[in-house]
A protein has these predicted regions:
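Conserved beta/loop motifs at nucleotide-recognition and modification sites
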Residues: 1-168
């Protein structure tokens, strides 16, 4: 399945991506979970990775972070002249059933070029998920698990994660 997840909050993007991956994979391993940064990776390499069979698993996920080619304002990129977008469009139109290809766009939905061939192929053959900003009452729901952890840490400091603490 092909997914395009867009939103301004990186935490919510990653959470949505993890939910999709957990549903399809169950267990995340370095072999069945591959992540590429599109600003440094050719789309041909991403398509090749998506076409490889998952070793020892029934399913795998390929994550494409920062797909600048989906934005209205495309950034200047050194690898742009070597990109073969038609290969990506062909893959999106005929995806491998044993692979989930997930595009993570860390921007609002209005910044995505919805007229591009790649976006239209994703929309026709996959799922587009636009994460909106939470409203006032939703912020409370989003932050509640985090705030409960803070309360637990105050009661029992040994439960705090082992990040560097300030020395006195």
């Amino acid at each position: 399945m092909i997914y395009l997840i867009s939103g301004k909050q990186n935490i919510r993007l990653k959470s949505q991506m993890k939910n999709i991956v957990k549903k399809s994979l169950g267990e995340i391993d370095a072999i069945n979970f591959v992540k590429h940064d599109a600003s440094y990776t050719l789309v041909q390499e991403i398509v090749d990775e998506a076409n490889y069979l998952p070793l020892g698993y029934d399913h795998k996920a390929v994550i494409v972070d920062n797909p600048y080619f989906l934005l209205k304002e495309k950034s200047k990129n050194k690898i742009e002249s070597d990109q073969n977008y038609q290969e990506l469009i062909d893959y999106i139109n005929h995806p491998d059933e044993s692979c989930d290809l997930i595009f993570l766009v860390n921007t609002s939905d209005s910044d995505i070029d919805k007229k591009s061939e790649i976006y239209q192929a994703i929309e026709a053959n996959g799922q587009v998920i636009a994460l909106t900003e939470p409203k006032e009452n939703e912020w409370i729901k989003c932050s509640r698990p985090w705030s409960l952890n803070i309360i637990a840490w105050k009661k029992k400091p040994s439960a705090m994660p082992a990040w560097p603490r300030r020395r006195r």
